[in-house]
Structures are given as structure tokens and as C-alpha cells.
């Protein structure tokens, strides 16, 4: 139990000792610049400034002691060796191998995995080149102009986020679209205006049984046929990303057009695998492999950097600090970079599906809060929506600001205004605004002054990239993955299963049968039974 560790007990006492200290005092001290220097880390093209946190050098030392006592780096090494650290599913956790090079010695169950990884990567590269060159055509001999990725969860969020983030690097030959929701509106609106003769579908499902994905895949199959694509030629319009060859063949997809991956790849960590085929088609193999290299650089940093200089380790420990010792139930991710607007959606799955657990690896209760709610939007939009709560609300919400020093699209004056707002929000959260400062600004109405006071002392990190390119994005995502791992390792939970999503899927099956007219096969609670009756009556 993490709360029984000596470092946890020391941190609990330390948190009480510094709770009343305002960060303004630390930044007013003569050694403020030294604080910034000490609490800044660089890795793989990213710069992390974590000086605006409610920590001292002693805090950092205790957090690193906690990591040591919890065996975080020992578990890290076990993961990278291919040991089965996903103990509930008896699987290795080797997403780092997906961005590896031939000389990297990643192993699962003792067997080298890089030959298979490189084989599938080459298959993806070859396929993308065939599509981009027009060698791969639809049934009528026309080149592919549009690609629709059908998937959900890890088969959608990561690739969708990357394709949006790197849209400025997109190849001109194809447009990539994403469909995830079983609500038919999602697919219908995506297909509206597309030409079936020049459209390719990627059906992305590890098991090829995912309800939402297969419903959309079958509907798209009907769309092709209804628009004149001969059934025998559907193979020119479908490829699969899956591990279930029999189901792929039964659907009608040529097994030669199946891209596989492995059970040591978790869905939310899979965009680097064949699940990223849509990314390769969107930005080209060269940019995709540059993204892999950026992630690999972060992997190497995480594996070898000293603890005090280890960016993912520090970020993960800060998350534990606020969740466990300040009661921060949520954490906000705000990229001041419009192309990263889907990053928070990706981060929600990455962190909340990984660490939304209440039992330890051995099944015992954890004894502390875990898995904060992750939320946010792109800046500056968030400033005009929810920043009021972050600044003056009754709870602490740690914020991660993410931005680039160079603009993605250059319009005169825009990027400097963006950066000014990003930096100002972090400063405002730190400093706050005292009653004296409010009055000094000319506010004479005594009743109004309390409403204009900002407590400040609200923590934030700032992550800087020189520019948003494939390498920096790869490093940013890999950093987030490893940060998530660190949190789970401290809490002693398995961050690589997701049993919490299974029960709802199981219960949906008999309800679906009832909605389609079958008699009830299971007993429901009164509320659910009433909802089913209403839905059936409305049909």
C-alpha cells in the first residue's frame, strides 16, 4: 500500500508544513532564478518548467524517495525488458518497441520483437506509397482520394489526434477521416460527399468484434455496394488492422490487406503500431517514422536520465503529489496550440483508463485517491470558458500549459498574442491578486473588492516545444505515456488493463436484443427496464 511507505508519511507531514506558504514568497526570494533553473528539465526537444508548483527542493527529494521506495524505476526496467508487468492479463507492455530501431533489443516472452515490428512498419510504408502513387486503386481503377478510419478508443483517439496535430504536414494525395461513434450520424455525415469509387476504409479493431466498430464497418460495406461497388471488388476498398485473421476474412477483407499487431500493445498505447496506418496515409511514411524517432528519444531519456533530470518521472510524481496530498480531483491540460486541440481527448483515455483504478496489483484496496479527472481544451478558448473556476474556484486544479515557440501557421501578431496569454495565465495562477492590489487599481467599492481578489498559489507546468513537428509530437506523447506509467507505479496499480469498460459492454448485449424485439433474457433494475420500454414504444 503506497500510503504505508515511509516517504509517503514524510510527504504527508511536509505537505502540512508548506501548505500555508504562498509561491509568491518563493519567487520574491533572492534565489528565485536558481529555483527556476533547478525546476527546469529538457529532453527530446521538450522543455519543462515546473517552477510554478507548490514544491521546494525538499519536496522533490521526498518525491524521488517515494519513487524509489515504490520501485518505480525497477518496474520501468522490467517493462522495458518485456516482463509481464500487466499482471491481470499476463502480458508484456512493450509499446516502446513500436518506435524502436533494428539494433534495439526488445523482447516478449524471451523472443525478440523488433523483426516483427519492422516487418509491419515496412508493410505500412509500402501500402502508403502504393496509395499515394495511385498504384492502389478502387474497383473502377481510380486512385484513392479519401480514407475513412473506423475504430473507437485507442483505435481512434490517438490517430485522430495526431492527424489533426500534424495536418500542416499532410500529403496532398488523400484526405483522412475518422468514424468512431455507433450513432449513425457520425458515419452518415462523414460519408456525405465522398465518392465510393475513390474511398478506402480502414477497419481498426484488435478483436474485430468491437460492437461500435463492426456496426460502422458493416454499414460502410452496404454503402459501397449500394453505390455500385461490386461485392467481389470490395477488397479494393477495405483493409483491416487486427489480430483476428479469421474474422477479417469472414468480413470479406483479403488477409493480404490485414495489418497486425500484438497482445503486448495496449489500445491506448497503440498509435505507433499498425493502428497508426491512418497517420501514415495522412502525413506519409517519412513523417510517421520521424514521429517514432521523437518518441524513441523520449524513451531513451526515460530509461537512462538521472531521476532529478527525468521529465516523465517528475511529471508523474507531481501528479501524485497533488492528488494524494492536496486533494486535487482533476487536472487540466491546455495546449496553447490549436492543432493540439484533440490532445486532451487523447490524454483523458491515456490517464483515466490507465489509472482509474481502486485496487492494487495484488487486488487489495489502495488506500488513497488515484486517477484524477483529466480535462481541458485548447487555449485561448479555455480562458473564456472554465478558467474562472481554476483561478477563483474552491478547489486546486493543477494545469499543464503546452505551447510552441514558433507558430504552425504564421499570421502577423497572432503567435505573440498566443504566447502572451499562455505565459500570463501561468503567472496569474501563481501570483493571484491581493485586496491591496485591487484597491491600487482604483477599485473603491469595498463590496466589490472580495470578488476581484485572486488567491493565487495555483500550480502549473509549462511544456515548451520549439515547433510542432512530427519529432516533438512523438516526444510529447511518449512523455505522457511514461508519466502515466509513473503514477500507476507509485499507486501500485496495473495501468495496462481496463476491466472497468467490460461490464457495460456485457450488459448492452441483452438490452440490444430486447430493443430489437426479443423477450427479456435478464432481469433489469426498475429504472433501466422503464427506459427500455420507452425506447421500444417509440420505435
From Swiss-Prot:
Protein name, per record: Glucose-6-phosphate isomerase
List GO BP terms, alphabetically: gluconeogenesis; glucose 6-phosphate metabolic process; glycolytic process
Cross-referenced InterPro entries: G6P_Isomerase, G6P_Isomerase_C, Phosphoglucose_isomerase_CS, SIS_dom_sf, SIS_PGI_1, SIS_PGI_2
Q: Which family does it belong to?
A: Belongs to the GPI family.
- EC number in record: 5.3.1.9
Matching entries from CDD domains are given as:
SIS_PGI_1, SIS_PGI_2
Q: Annotated pathway, please?
A: Carbohydrate biosynthesis; gluconeogenesis; Carbohydrate degradation; glycolysis; D-glyceraldehyde 3-phosphate and glycerone phosphate from D-glucose: step 2/4
Q: Where is the active site?
A: 353 (proton donor), 384, 505
**GO cellular component terms, A-Z:** cytosol
Judged by the first EC level, this protein's enzyme class is isomerase
Q: Which reaction does it catalyse?
A: alpha-D-glucose 6-phosphate = beta-D-fructose 6-phosphate
Function, as annotated, reads:
Catalyzes the reversible isomerization of glucose-6-phosphate to fructose-6-phosphate.
Q: Where in the cell is it found?
A: Cytoplasm
Amino acid at each position: 500500500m503506497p500510503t504505508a511507505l515511509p516517504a509517503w508519511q514524510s510527504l504527508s507531514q511536509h505537505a502540512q508544513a508548506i501548505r500555508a506558504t504562498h509561491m509568491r514568497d518563493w519567487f520574491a526570494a533572492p534565489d528565485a532564478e536558481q529555483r527556476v533553473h533547478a525546476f527546469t528539465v529538457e529532453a527530446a526537444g521538450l522543455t519543462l518548467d515546473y517552477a510554478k508548483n507548490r514544491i521546494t527542493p525538499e519536496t522533490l527529494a521526498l518525491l524521488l524517495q517515494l519513487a524509489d521506495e515504490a520501485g518505480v524505476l525497477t518496474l520501468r526496467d522490467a517493462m522495458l525488458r518485456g516482463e509481464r508487468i500487466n499482471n491481470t492479463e499476463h502480458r508484456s507492455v512493450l509499446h516502446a518497441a513500436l518506435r524502436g530501431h533494428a539494433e534495439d533489443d526488445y523482447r516478449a516472452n524471451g523472443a525478440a520483437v523488433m523483426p516483427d515490428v519492422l516487418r509491419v512498419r515496412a508493410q505500412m510504408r509500402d501500402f502508403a506509397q502504393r496509395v499515394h502513387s495511385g498504384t492502389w486503386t478502387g474497383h473502377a481503377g481510380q486512385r484513392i482520394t479519401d480514407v475513412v478510419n473506423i475504430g473507437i478508443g485507442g483505435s481512434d483517439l490517438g490517430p485522430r489526434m495526431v492527424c489533426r496535430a500534424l495536418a500542416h504536414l499532410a500529403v496532398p494525395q488523400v484526405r483522412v477521416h475518422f468514424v468512431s461513434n455507433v450513432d449513425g450520424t457520425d458515419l452518415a455525415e462523414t460519408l456525405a460527399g465522398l465518392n465510393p469509387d475513390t474511398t478506402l476504409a480502414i477497419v481498426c479493431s484488435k478483436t474485430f468484434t468491437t460492437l461500435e466498430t463492426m456496426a460502422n464497418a458493416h454499414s460502410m460495406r452496404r454503402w459501397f455496394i449500394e453505390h455500385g461497388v461490386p461485392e467481389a471488388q470490395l477488397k479494393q476498398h477495405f483493409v483491416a488492422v487486427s489480430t483476428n485473421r479469421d474474422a477479417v476474412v469472414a468480413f470479406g477483407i483479403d488477409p493480404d490487406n490485414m495489418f497486425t499487431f500484438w497482445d503486448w500493445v495496449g489500445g491506448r498505447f497503440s498509435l505507433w503500431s499498425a493502428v497508426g496506418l491512418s497517420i501514415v496515409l495522412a502525413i506519409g511514411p517519412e513523417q510517421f517514422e520521424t514521429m517514432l524517432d521523437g518518441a524513441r528519444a523520449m524513451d531513451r531519456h526515460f530509461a537512462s536520465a538521472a531521476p532529478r533530470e527525468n521529465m516523465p518521472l517528475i511529471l508523474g510524481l507531481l501528479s501524485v503529489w497533488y492528488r494524494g496530498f492536496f486533494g486535487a480531483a482533476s487536472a487540466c491540460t491546455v495546449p496553447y496550440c490549436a492543432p493540439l486541440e484533440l490532445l486532451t481527448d487523447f490524454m483523458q483515455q491515456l490517464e483515466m483508463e490507465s489509472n482509474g483504478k481502486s485496487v492494487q496489483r495484488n487486488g487489495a484496496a489502495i488506500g488513497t485517491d488515484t486517477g484524477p479527472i483529466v480535462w481541458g481544451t485548447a487555449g485561448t478558448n479555455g480562458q473564456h470558458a472554465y478558467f474562472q473556476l481554476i483561478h477563483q474556484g474552491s478547489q486546486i486544479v493543477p494545469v499543464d500549459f503546452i505551447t510552441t515557440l514558433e507558430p504552425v501557421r504564421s499570421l502577423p501578431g497572432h503567435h505573440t498574442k498566443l504566447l502572451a496569454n499562455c505565459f500570463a495565465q501561468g503567472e496569474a495562477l501563481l501570483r493571484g491578486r491581493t485586496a491591496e492590489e485591487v484597491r491600487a487599481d482604483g477599485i473603491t467599492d469595498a463590496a466589490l473588492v472580495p470578488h476581484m481578489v485572486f488567491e493565487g498559489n495555483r500550480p502549473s507546468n509549462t511544456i515548451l516545444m520549439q515547433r510542432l513537428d512530427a519529432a516533438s509530437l512523438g516526444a510529447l506523447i511518449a512523455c505522457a505515456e511514461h508519466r502515466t506509467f509513473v503514477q500507476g507505479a507509485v499507486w501500485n496499480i496495473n495501468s495496462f488493463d481496463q476491466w472497468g469498460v467490460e461490464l457495460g459492454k456485457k450488459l448492452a448485449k441483452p438490452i440490444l436484443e430486447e430493443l430489437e424485439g426479443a423477450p427479456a433474457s435478464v432481469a433489469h433494475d426498475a429504472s433501466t427496464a422503464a427506459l427500455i420500454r420507452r425506447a421500444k414504444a417509440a420505435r
